[in-house]
């Protein structure tokens, strides 16, 4: 089963050394991978490539997703703040 993620989705890592950490999907890659970032450990300039099988979607950050889709600049501080203040976590 292939999971369909969108830009701005809030995900929890279920496998690996980053298990139970919360991230946002910042880019969709081919072959069942997405690039995730949290603005701190994995900044937007160096997102982590993660297999979608190892992620669980728990919500969506609309403002971040809209900015990423339109190509507008998103800052690490903005992403980190959005993840912290969302009522998802």
Tell what function each PLM region has.
Residues 1-7, 14, 24-89:
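Ferredoxin-like alpha/beta domains used as RNA- or RNAP-binding modules
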Residues 16-19:
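Short, charged beta-turn/beta-strand-edge "cap" motif at the junction between a beta-strand
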